[in-house]
Structure formats: C-alpha cells, structure tokens
C-alpha cells in the first residue's frame, strides 16, 4: 500500500497528514504542551546556548514554548517565519551566537516537525504553499518568496530522508487532492 504524505507549513501552525490508497486521511499526532498530543504544531523555534562553548539547543513547536517559559526568555524565540519570505528587508537573524538565514530557519523547523511525528513518513511529500505569500506586493516579492522556498524543501529532504518533495498551491495540497491526482 502506498501513501501520500502532506505537510502544511503554516505561518502560525503546521500539520502533517497521510492519505492511503483507499482515500483515508489521517492527521498525525504531534507533541502538545504538558505531554499531550495535538494535530497542529505551533510554527515556532526557540534557540538557546548550551553548556558547552558554541553549543546551540533548538526547540520547536510546543517544546519551544515550554523552553522559552522555563528559561525566563533568556534565548531567542522566533515565530511567523513564513511571513518574512517575501520581504527583502529580512534575510535571516542572529540566535545563540550565530546567524541563521531564513532558509535555515525553515529547514530547521521542518526537521523538528518531521522528527516529532512518530510514524515513518517514507521519502515523498507534498508541501502546501500559499498562492500568494503574505507581504508580497509585487511580482518581485512573490518571486523572492518562491526562491527562498526552493532550498528549504531540498535541504530538509537531504537531511531527513525525504528524497522527493513537491510544492503545491493550497488547496490542491490538501489530503483529498493528493489521492485524486497523480503527483507521484
């Protein structure tokens, strides 16, 4: 049985779902605050310095919020990463003593999201993307956002065993659409 994997990388929340050949779609459980589970994960990263020189500890989703609260805000909390893709004014940021390009921030979040899923996702996925990125006021802004997403899908693929990722405009990237089209 083959299955399609879909990742909704959202500005505020993200989710992962699978659809099997029979059309059954399942949102996968992700860790929630307090040890529970949820079907959506906050699209948020938290960076803090580790005990060893140069060590950087990175948390994502619910764990990022918990670490931020536990540390008294001593690290760097980064949210709404996707909302900066179209902006020429934001190309990256500093956190825990080093610079991270926006592509690295997104790839880091996607690796953490994939690692939080307790199911083998296989090696292929469809990643939803907006028809128009937030803040894209010109064709150049939209192109910038799209250019910044190209490396982020390849990079997580090479570091998380996803060998075949494709981007699809929403709502075509939603689970029912995956099983009715020949994406693979």
Model-derived segments and spans:
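Conserved phosphate-binding catalytic cores of ATP/NTP-utilizing and phosphoryl-transfer enzymes
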Residues: 1-3, 157-184
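N-terminal glycine/serine-rich phosphate-binding loop of ATP-dependent small-molecule kinases
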Residues: 1-5, 12, 19-25, 155-156
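A short acidic Gly-Thr/Ser loop motif
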Residues: 7-13, 130, 177-184
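Generic beta-strand/beta-sheet core signal
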Residues: 10, 19, 128-130, 164
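Short acidic, glycine/serine/threonine-rich loops at helix termini
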Residues: 18-19, 137-141, 172-176
